Amino acid sequence: MTTRYIFVTGGVVSSLGKGIAAASLAAILEARGLNVTIMKLDPYINVDPGTMSPTQHGEVFVTEDGAETDLDLGHYERFIRTKMNRRNNFTTGRIYEEVLRKERRGDYLGATIQVIPHITNAIKEKVLAGGEGHDVAIVEIGGTVGDIESLPFLESIRQLGVELGRDRTLFMHLTLVPFLGAAGEVKTKPTQHSVKELRSIGIAPDVLVCRGDRAIPANEKAKISLFCNVEERAVISLKDVDSIYKIPALLRSQGLDDLVVKRFGLECREADLSEWENVIYQEANPNGEVVIGMVGKYIELPDAYKSVNEALKHAGLKNRVSVTIKYIDSQTVEAKGEEVLQGLDGILVPGGFGERGVEGKILAAKFARENNLPYFGICLGMQVALIEFARNVAGMADAHSTEFNKETPFPVVGLITEWIDEEGNVEQRHEASDLGGTMRLGAQLCHLLEGSKAAQAYKGNSCVERHRHRYEVNNKYRERLEQAGMIFSGLSSDRKLVEMIELKDHPWFVAGQFHPEFTSTPRDGHPLFEGFIAAASAHQKRDLK
C-alpha cells in the first residue's frame, strides 16, 4: 500500500488547534472510505509526557498498547475509528535517546553523530513506519514555526517532501488571522510572515488553514493567496465554533478533502458525515441539564482532564441532556467541607498522583455515599472511595494508601509489585523503580460480576479498559470490605487484582481502577459514563419531586 502524507504545521501563535484541524480532516477522509492515521511529533526533550505536570502539559493520553502520549492523540481517537499506538507519538527526547543508544552500541561505526543526517533520518524512519498500512497519514508537528526546538522535525519533513514527491506529500499550515476592532478588519500580515518563515527553511505550504473569530472575507482570502503563493481555493477559513465536532463539516464545505483527494490521485466516494450531523443535532437539542462536580487537584487547567470532560459530554449526548461540569478543588473541600458539594447531580473523582488534596477527595466520596448521590471514581477516584469506606463503614480507622502514608495501620491500597500485562507477560516493580514508564499501562481484560451495575452497563461479563497506575487494592482486606457491604464487581484477567468496586443499597456508586475516558467517543459514548449521567439525571428528577 502506498501511503500519502499530510504534514500539519502551525504559525503565529501556539494553541491554534492543529490537533483538532488534523483530526477533523482525518474524519472527513475516513468518511470517504479511506484508511487514515494521525501522528504527533512533539519537540520537547522529555522521552514522553508520562512524568510531566498535568497543569503544564495537560492530560497524558494512554493508548491500547500502553504508550503515555500527548493529549492530541485523544482528539485523534475521538474523531476517527483508527486506534492510536506508541508509533503515533514521539518526542525529540525519544529520538535522541534511541540515537544515543545506537551510538553506544557502535551501530554508527564511529561516525560523528549529527542532527543532519542522524537525527533527521531517525525522525523520517518513524514517520514512514507510523504511516505503513494506511492510505493517508496526517503528521502534526508540535510547536510553532520559528521555535528552535521544532527545527529537526521541520527539516525532516522537508526532506520527506523531496524524497516522496508532490504526489505523496502535502503541507498544511495553520495560521492566525486576527480581527482588529479599532481598524474594523482582519489582518493578514501575521500569516504572510509565518509563511515567509516556513519557506525560509524550505517548506512551501500547499494549504493554509486560517484561524480567526470570524469567517475571512473573499477579498482577504485572495490577498493571502497572492502574498503566500497558495491557490485561492487552498486558503481555508476556520472560524471559532461552539463545538469542535462542527469542524469536519466546516472544512468539508470549503472543499478541503476534495483538494487532498485530487492532489493524491485517490479514487474514493463522497464524504458521508451523517454520523457527525447526528452528534451536532444531539448536542444542540438536549432535553435537560445535569451538573456534575469534578473533584480534582489540577482544575486550574481543564485540559488536565480533557478526556474525562469529553466523555461526560458524550454521555450527555447519549442521554439527551447537556452536562455542566463544576470544577471543585479537592483542597477547597478539605478547607470548607460539604458546603462546596451542594447542588450537584453527581460527583466524579478523576485520577491523580501525590498526597495534596487527597483528603478532600475522600470527603467527596463520603458525601456521595451518605447522600445517595451518584458517584463515579476513576483510578485514584476508586482508591479514595475504598479508603473512605474502610475508615467509616468497615471499622478500619486511619486506613489509607501506602502512596500517602507508609505507616498506616490499614494499608487498604498498596504498590503493585507484580501483574500480567496485555501480552501475558509478568511485570514486576518495586519502590525504587523509575517513575517514567514503570506503571501498569495499557489495555487490560476485566472480568465483571454477574448482576452488578458494571455488568449491566457493559451488557456482558467482561470489558477491556486502559490502565495507568502503580497502586491497587490490597487483597489482604478484600474479605473484610466485602463483609461490610462493598462489592468487587471487576477483577483482572487472572482475577488477582480488583478493577472495579460498587456499593450495595446505593443508586449508583461505581468506581474503576482503569481510565474509561480514553475509549469514549462522541459517536459511540462509553457505557460507564452513560450509566453515570443517567443516574445523575434520575437523581435530579427525584429531587424535583
Swiss-Prot record:
Its EC number is 6.3.4.2. PROSITE patterns: GATASE_TYPE_1. CTP binds at S14, D147, I148, E149, K187, T188, K189, P190, T191, Q192, K223. Keywords: ATP-binding, Glutamine amidotransferase, Ligase, Magnesium, Metal-binding, Nucleotide-binding, Pyrimidine biosynthesis. InterPro entries: Class_I_gatase-like, CTP_synthase, CTP_synthase_N, GATASE, GATase1_CTP_Synthase, P-loop_NTPase. L-glutamine binds at G352, L380, G381, M382, Q383, E403, R470. Mg(2+) binds at D72, E140. Residues 1-266 are annotated as: Amidoligase domain. SUPFAM superfamilies: Class I glutamine amidotransferase-like, P-loop containing nucleoside triphosphate hydrolases. ATP binds at S15, L16, G17, K18, G19, I20, D72, K239, D240, V241. The active site is at C379, H515, E517. Allosterically activated by GTP, when glutamine is the substrate; GTP has no effect on the reaction when ammonia is the substrate. The allosteric effector GTP functions by stabilizing the protein conformation that binds the tetrahedral intermediate(s) formed during glutamine hydrolysis. Inhibited by the product CTP, via allosteric rather than competitive inhibition. The keyword ATP-binding applies. It catalyses: UTP + L-glutamine + ATP + H2O = CTP + L-glutamate + ADP + phosphate + 2 H(+); L-glutamine + H2O = L-glutamate + NH4(+); UTP + NH4(+) + ATP = CTP + ADP + phosphate + 2 H(+). Catalyzes the ATP-dependent amination of UTP to CTP with either L-glutamine or ammonia as the source of nitrogen. Regulates intracellular CTP levels through interactions with the four ribonucleotide triphosphates. CTPSs have evolved a hybrid strategy for distinguishing between UTP and CTP. The overlapping regions of the product feedback inhibitory and substrate sites recognize a common feature in both compounds, the triphosphate moiety. To differentiate isosteric substrate and product pyrimidine rings, an additional pocket far from the expected kinase/ligase catalytic site, specifically recognizes the cytosine and ribose portions of the product inhibitor. Belongs to the CTP synthase family. Homotetramer. This is CTP synthase. It comes from Shewanella baltica (strain OS223).
